[in-house]
A protein has these predicted regions:
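Cyclophilin-like peptidyl-prolyl cis-trans isomerases
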Residues: 1-168
């Protein structure tokens, strides 16, 4: 099976290249590629950054306005999707969600370090193959609280300038 290759261009930080795994999470990969093709991620930010854990983006603008996307089925073992055995190790891309296992839409996270407690609980669907230095730099930004409910928000926006599909 061919693994799609994508690039995530982050303003002032550089580029992360990732390989996606449709054999692990086919609908997740198809949804992510469709969002990239639609330009959905352009101008959105990494809005939650926890050094030693992960960076999360794909759902908020620089002004912290939420951008909605359609939800898809969560393709992970605890949700009955047994073929996804991807471990949440450094560099893995995975879908963020609420408590509802079928609430993943556009928000994703990139593992800064291994987090085995997420295995089988979230839909991992790819892995950074180049640009781990970019991941490290993003994970090191200063964060704080936004409003009364959002924690680990970067003090200065970490903007996804664009994402591109290198190959399908």
């Amino acid at each position: 099976m061919t693994h799609p290759i994508i690039r995530i261009h982050v303003r002032d930080f550089g580029t992360m290249t990732a390989e996606l795994y449709p054999e692990k999470a086919p609908k997740t990969v198809a949804n992510f590629l469709a969002l990239i093709e639609d330009g959905f991620f352009e101008g959105l930010i990494f809005h939650r950054i926890i050094k030693g854990f992960m960076i999360q983006g794909g759902g908020y603008t620089e002004d912290m306005e939420h951008k909605d996307a359609e939800s898809i089925r969560g393709e992970f073992k605890a949700n009955g999707f047994m073929q996804n055995d991807l471990k949440h190790t450094r560099g893995v891309l995975s879908m963020a969600r609420t408590q509802d296992p079928d609430s993943a839409s556009s928000q994703f996270f990139v593992m800064h370090m291994d987090a085995p407690h997420l295995d089988a609980q979230y839909a991992g669907f790819g892995k950074v193959t180049e640009g781990l230095d970019v991941l490290d730099a993003i994970a090191s930004v200063k964060t704080g609280t936004y409003g009364w409910y959002m924690q680990d928000v970067p003090k200065v926006p970490v903007v996804i300038e664009r994402m591109e599909i290198v190959s399908k």
